[in-house]
Amino acid sequence: MASRWPLRLTACFALFLASAVLRAGGSEDPPLGRQTVEAGVQTLPGATTDRAVLDRYCVTCHNSRTRTGGLALDTVDVTRVAPDAETWEKVVRKIRGRMMPPPGLPRPDEATYDALALHLEGALDRAAAARPNPGRTETFRRLTRVEYQNAVRDILALDVDVSSLLPKDDASHGFDNVSNGELSPTLLERYLAAAQKVSRAAVGSALPSPASHVVVLPSDLTQEDHLEGLPFGTHGGVVFPYTFPQHAVYEIQVRLARDRNENVEGLTEPQQVEISIDGSLVQTLLVKPNRNQSGAYYADEAVDKHLKVRIGVGAGPHDVAVTFPRKTFALEETERQPSLARFNMDRHPRVQLAVYSVSITGPFETSEANETPSRQRLFVCRPSRSTAAAEAACAKRIVSTLARRAFRRPVADADIEAPLRFYREARATGDFDAGIEMAVRAVLASTEFLFRIEREPKNVATHTPYRVSDEELASRLSFFLWSSVPDDELLDLASAGRLSQPATLERQVRRMLADKKSEALVTTFASQWLYLRNLAATSPDARQFPDFDDNLRQAFRRETELFFESIVKEDRSALDLLRANYTFVNERLAKHYGIPNVYGSRFRRVELGEDSVRGGLLGHGSILTVTSYANRTSPVLRGKWILENLVGTPPPPPPANVPLLQETDAQGRVLSMRERMVQHRSRAECASCHRLMDPAGLSMENFDAIGRWRTRTESGSAVDASGGLPDGSEFTGASGLRTALLRRPELFVGTLTEKLMTYGLGRGLEYSDAPSVRAIVHGAQTQDYRFSSLVLGIVRSDPFQMRMSQ
């Protein structure tokens, strides 16, 4: 079985034993080429030089007797790297990251480091070119929930939420599209249920009974201000997209937010509630306080039961909105703490109405199906006559067109035989549309749709690299850049055998990156790489951080999404992810960051001053929050995130039963975070990893657990933000970390390339992929590492265009 790459070496890999014959201390040795003849080292880089470097700095621990970290470098032949390519790739990674020898022991100088790495990389790259190994993706890869939903959107012009129908995807290698082809009976039932829902919505068939869809707002969502997408002169509420399954009457009902005693908050006088669809006002409703009660709260369960309206709505996607008109006079506000609702109740009550939930129930009083976008997309023809032959011909055309898009390849009669059989059976007891609905259901339940299938060509030898077909290349492209199926243009080029032509391929990649569907790179790739998905489950302690609410949580995520999107859409340098002098904020986030003159809930791009701490990802509240604990910062989590996602040298997993950090010393004095980390590193089982992680994480200590700038820690002591990286560089603060990362840009760009490649291939990288990664980074360097140069490099690479036979 192929090994995972980059391999997570054990903690001992980077440790040199205290009894090593190397000199003690952290001095940097002169280049080996300038040393005495007795050292036996040649001036020019080569195998003899490499052997001498390894013997001097590595073999003392990494030998066949001690095998520190499971690695022996005394027996490998430095003149023949191909037989031990996996071992040498480990060595190169450690050398490039300056992770060995570890800090505190003699190290080569920069010239020797680079010479050794360049020579080994050159030999490894030549060996890889002589015997290409593009790796092997799984033959069957099941679509993720996001891919399924996007595919339905693009095939049928239908937005259907399938999150409640399909199970959550497990992640591997950091991404949920790295999956296998398992399909249990339970999972098959879920897919059949999803196919039934989608096919019914696509055709516009009547539902067996009215159904309800409920949108519940987070309890810590502040609704005192105007929200983007709602009419001016209103405050609070919600606007959300909803696909109405049929042309019919629906009931929209609003429930207001309450406190723990079920009293409606902010209801001290009659107030209005507006319900609108697609920006058009449907109805204004009046809610009044209970006359039989006095005071600010009214324990009347029925006070908002009348807040509902029935309205005819056309099938298809619409925006539903509920909000509150502002009074003509200003309400007196209190400084309500926007934390979890249970801490706001009674102590800091809302002074204005707020929406708790909006439910949509229906359809009622259905009418004839109208031409929705999904029907227009699906019904590429209508029977010319009401005869069996005319209907059969049209049905075949509809199913063939649908199957080509769903199966991502040309289809033959055998491919559509089963869907057409379902059509005929349903048509025998229903109308033409009923038959088409069953055919759609059969297509969506087919393994050809649910799985990305890559078949080996006939007569290909075992363990032999081969080029994937143009149809498979189209699918790789579309799922990489769009998280969806190929469009007709891609399929047409693939069918003609032209997609793999270099000029055509580049044009298509640039077209796809410019398409709105490339936002999937933000919502699926970046959100997993940068841990944005973890924000939803992040709840900072409400007592320590009363200013944190769902508005801020959403703003954190949106800032980073818009920022990454700007890198993609504007084709900026990948280094701008670290060094950009701009970000995206709304009023809520701007106040949190201390950025003046930003008003309203709309996000806008703002330029940052040279001394701003918010430039690049390192200043984003999203990342600073998900790498913290609920009540304090975590240099460990932040350091691990930096090493894994920016530097590309992830530490090994922690040992079991790691003891908690002690917050006080023996005398009861509260320890600073740095003192706690020193204590942690004093443990032998912890030291090897924490020596690498902690210094990087400690450099971010000027940001608290919700990303605010600070000069004092939770315990009141002055922040010490001095830190370092495994390469021995030392600096202070996030700006120093940024400078250190930019000093050797190939490390960060290489890490981003590995992440993109893992996501694009849908498999974990192996040691054999390293030459391709190096080639991509080297090629992108001439273009200042523009994002498109990385994507094009990946798409042109052997791992993306080829596959190893079984």
What are these regions (language model features)?
Residues 74:
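Short, aromatic/basic-rich helix-turn unit that serves as a nucleic-acid recognition element
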Residues 2, 21-71, 83-90, 94-99, ...:
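Low-complexity, glycine/serine/threonine/alanine-rich intrinsically disordered linker
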Residues 10-20:
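Bacterial N-terminal signal peptides
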